[in-house]
């Protein structure tokens, strides 16, 4: 997070508030829309945790102070008009008071573009189950059993992918590949490998390498 941000550049409304969009820094998922004033922004920068201003209670509040669902701030940006801020966070639990991961869990409209975020969203959910286990949840069960159980499942799913491909059954293959990808994401979380790490490796292999070959 940039500590040298100048709050004076921000355009607060007549009540001294500015809308703050909170976004997961890894998955890109929008978690909530809240409001900040100069004091809450200052406390956010000083503590590396999100602080907002409650319009209803007319006081500052720290996300996770009661629930434990803290948000560690990675970056704060402001838009071209300086009248809204974007807060990138590492969320330690659900953002919504309902228990949902994001406050934006009701869809007004959706098209295929939304599918682009499904893998980061699944990865974020897996991370949440790892850091905050839920009794009876399959993902939490895998983490509880450890790496040997996860590797066993990956081996089983890989075998089922091979069988589905040999059977030339597209629907079955799609299903088995989805299972393999899910368990691979679980292993990544267990081993501390992020989607960003994978993207960087693929970039080195397919973009940088291609550029070097052209030189």
From Swiss-Prot:
GO molecular function annotations of the record: ATP binding; phosphoribosyl-AMP cyclohydrolase activity; phosphoribosyl-ATP diphosphatase activity
Keywords from the named record: Amino-acid biosynthesis, ATP-binding, Cytoplasm, Histidine biosynthesis, Hydrolase, Multifunctional enzyme, Nucleotide-binding
Keyword Mitochondrion in annotation: no
Gene Ontology process terms (BP): L-histidine biosynthetic process
A Gene Ontology term for the protein's cellular component: cytoplasm
Reaction(s) catalysed (UniProt annotation): 1-(5-phospho-beta-D-ribosyl)-ATP + H2O = 1-(5-phospho-beta-D-ribosyl)-5'-AMP + diphosphate + H(+); 1-(5-phospho-beta-D-ribosyl)-5'-AMP + H2O = 1-(5-phospho-beta-D-ribosyl)-5-[(5-phospho-beta-D-ribosylamino)methylideneamino]imidazole-4-carboxamide
Annotated EC: 3.5.4.19, 3.6.1.31
Keyword Signal: no
HAMAP family in UniProt: HisE (MF_01020), HisI (MF_01021), HisIE (MF_01019)
PANTHER family: HISTIDINE BIOSYNTHESIS BIFUNCTIONAL PROTEIN, HISTIDINE BIOSYNTHESIS BIFUNCTIONAL PROTEIN HISIE
Designated name of the protein: Histidine biosynthesis bifunctional protein HisIE
Organism name: Oceanobacillus iheyensis (strain DSM 14371 / CIP 107618 / JCM 11309 / KCTC 3954 / HTE831)
Gene name, Swiss-Prot/TrEMBL: hisI
